[in-house]
Amino acid sequence: MSDVAVMILAGGQGERLSILSRQRAKPAVPFGGKYRIIDFALSNCVNSGLYDVAVLTQYRPHSLNEHIGHGRPWDLDRERNGGVVILQPYLGRSTSGWYRGTADAVYHNLFYITRRPYRDVLILAGDHVYAMDYRPMIAQHRERCADVTIAVQPVDWREASRFGVVIVAEDGWVVDFEEKPERPRSNLASMGIYLFRRNLLLDLFTRDHPDAPEFIDFGRDVIPYLIRTARVATYRFDGYWQDVGTVQSYWEANMALLEDEPKLNLYDPNWRIHTRSEERPPAKILEGATVIRSLLSNGCIVEGATVIRSILSPGVIVKAGAVVRDSIVMTDSVIGPGAVVDRCIIDKHVTIGANAYLGWGDDNSPNWLEPSRLNTGITLVGRNAVVPPGVRIGRNVLIGPEVKESDFPGAVVPSGETVNPIATVVWS
């Protein structure tokens, strides 16, 4: 579809993911062992025949830029007939500073959709995990002669307040939109996927609209205004879609991949999820090892250890006698001999010392520093951290990036505590 331009919003910080997104943009967070979250939006584009793709970055873009590069893994390294471009905030005569919101990001990059005579512009969130063919949505949008079409999915009523929700009339047109309401009137959640007529989008941002708010955010400003002034439709998507914006939802979405028939099938030959992969040897499981219901990426070595219901990214080494259970361990981390890692998320290049125990005990006290993010028993270990041998670390513990052995004040880290190299913490 050469008449559709795609803009992927990938500049979000994702604060609710705690230290997982402290040193990288949320779309660059690893997922499912070998992938990153942005891989799903990019793969959906090329699998849908959409090759004109712009990725709008902002917060800590280095790892995301490095991952996407020229777009070769997604067949987006094209000089003609499409290709991927990465657009970052820039200083110019009429623009300054960072993007203030999703709509502001698109406004500052309108030049991208004027390069060719596109008919429509597809705007995607780059921080969701899903497998979606965009072609039926585009077809419905054009058949209904809609100005804007919003992809929606029903969610549990108890979760609806986490999303922007739409209210639809009997004739199928949207009559109201509420951004993360305390008392939602609908459970039809916006997926952060918007399909605009290009000319309407250009008119919206380049002409005066005296009765309009300042267009900073699509959910808060643009969509409510267009509901009053344009034809806004919905496209209901019933396939797999997950907002992995919290530590718990991120962990659950990864663990769901281990089911016999997961809703997100990474093995579907008709809908491949592409990624940038390093050249690494196959995973190796040595004598005496036990691996049950787990995903092991290339370069992993399990040396007579036990891995249960866990996901290991490339290059992870689990030493003899160690146990990894219900956990996510990212690239090139080493689990020392005899160590136990239970219900943890371990970032890249972490070293867990021999006989250390992470996820120790039954105390589920929330983390004192981030109680709203770490309260379900998951312990987080930041990138490049070194955990000393023999230490006991409870649940809902936050081990910051770059922590060294000398940053640990004792042999026991109680549940709900934090170890951070920036501050000295004294526990009673």
From Swiss-Prot:
HAMAP family: GlgC. Homotetramer. It is an enzyme of class 2 (transferase). Keywords: ATP-binding, Carbohydrate metabolism, Glycogen biosynthesis, Glycogen metabolism, Nucleotide-binding, Nucleotidyltransferase, Transferase. The keyword Lipid metabolism does not apply. GO terms for molecular function: ATP binding; glucose-1-phosphate adenylyltransferase activity. Involved in the biosynthesis of ADP-glucose, a building block required for the elongation reactions to produce glycogen. Catalyzes the reaction between ATP and alpha-D-glucose 1-phosphate (G1P) to produce pyrophosphate and ADP-Glc. Its EC number is 2.7.7.27. The keyword Protease does not apply. It comes from Thermomicrobium roseum (strain ATCC 27502 / DSM 5159 / P-2). One of its GO terms (biological process) is glycogen biosynthetic process. Alpha-D-glucose 1-phosphate binds at residues 99, 164, 179-180, 190. SUPFAM superfamilies: Nucleotide-diphospho-sugar transferases, Trimeric LpxA-like enzymes. This is Glucose-1-phosphate adenylyltransferase. Disulfide bonds: none annotated. Pathway: Glycan biosynthesis; glycogen biosynthesis. It catalyses: alpha-D-glucose 1-phosphate + ATP + H(+) = ADP-alpha-D-glucose + diphosphate. PROSITE patterns: ADP_GLC_PYROPHOSPH_2 (PS00809). Belongs to the bacterial/plant glucose-1-phosphate adenylyltransferase family. NCBIfam families: glgC, PRK05293.1.
